[in-house]
Amino acid sequence: MAKSGHESQEDPRNRDILIYVNGAMKKRDEAVVSVFDSGCVLGDGVWEGLRVSHGHPAFLDQHLDRLYEGAKAIALDIGLDRGALTRAVYATL
């Protein structure tokens, strides 16, 4: 794991997590983005945090509405249509 100047404590539950990156599930150590990605170069991005209950994200439609609205406001292409993003969300559960 990358080191930083911030104090943190490793959570053993995160040791074997898989991360969705560009259409594929990646092991933690393989989940990378290019340093030329606009999120790195420009610091742009939008995000939504989801609460999952019984295998389903609560209020997913409202979260996706806000995500796409935020992306539109900064001219950010999510890269997935709503259906594909919904499938990607469920793939991570």
Where does each model-flagged region fall?
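Conserved alpha/beta cores of soluble small-molecule-handling proteins
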Residues: 1-93
